[in-house]
């Protein structure tokens, strides 16, 4: 029966092929069903969120990316997730031999045994010169190309729910010209849809530019990109969806990593402002003069910038607020972009601040963050886990300068920071941000990066010179 069905696909005229194939699939008991809301989970952290639940069954998708962007790893991850869901998966390799695929998968701790891997690489199919001579044959013989026929036979015989062809760039070589390749692709996608199969193809960007018919043939186009950062310090990977027929999706570029666990994606979600009712509580520093200056303290749920030049006590003041919040049984967390936890503990002991008991009780946490190791959206995801799941009431960031200097590799730090603050405000979290200014004396300047609009309160620490001596002063220049 497989040969009969494939005969319709390969041998008869194009005008009749489409109708006869559909009729034949109906005779086989495969009915064309309307799209439902059911989704096929990708098994890739973050991608289901970007695609609003996963891929739509019976649709065809293409992963577009240059070599090394993660197309093969992502495809295998998707097939392995299907195995977990009791779905049969087939991987048709046009490039790598199965033994190399399995070897690379083993480095990720994956067992590809449940996936059927079909080898269509050059070594398996035969000498490419054989196919390069197609132009000398009559068209009727050309359409009997064994690779196209074999794909059809495999799908009909194995009846997979998930299929990957890696890649259609190489599949192009098995058609005599672009026109015939486009016809083959359109019919293949129709055939897979009627067979109840969800397909993922991969190709390179140049191929998509040269053959735009692929864009209209598939239901979804997903781009994987890799570039060097602006200062050429790190690689930046992201994924974005150009087309996703039948569904909404999260727009924009979403950072991704290839880790020892496979592909991980960190969705770029623009947080929305939400009105939060505050209890009217205040967080006090327990420094009488400062609390009087602040009208009793800092209101819960607000954002405060502590700004000033180096050495004025900004970090110590922020830690003082966090300690007092923790002593009042509120959970507090400090994200440090510059100092390690050990350095902060040493400094706090030197000024008589007993931080360790609060750390041991779990009321206070100090978390050192190397911004070069995290994408901004990855950092925000870590904050969501800390604030949302671990229920922190107060958060501090030390410092905005360290955050800005490294996170600017990924784009506008002000936009990313605003996203973080918007999320924290929606959670009712009290936020302290430490900002270092460059000027020691002279003109008054709140911040160097122009972020004062994010703050409800601004505490300014400065140096003054009096009678040949340097002193420190503090003032509250903004309080809502």
Give, region by region, the residue ranges found by the protein language model.
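Short, positively charged and aromatic/hydrophobic N-terminal segments
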Residues: 8, 17-19, 26
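Conserved P-loop NTPase
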Residues: 31-38, 126, 140, 158, ...
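Pre-Walker A adenine-sensing motif
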Residues: 44-54, 287-297
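Walker A/P-loop NTP-binding active-site region of P-loop NTPases
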Residues: 54-115, 294-354
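P-loop NTPase motor core
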Residues: 61, 139-217, 221, 375-454, ...
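Conserved inter-motif catalytic segment of the P-loop NTP-binding fold
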Residues: 87-173, 330, 334-408
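Conserved nucleotide-binding/hydrolysis micro-motifs of P-loop NTPases
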Residues: 95-99, 107, 121-125, 169-171, ...
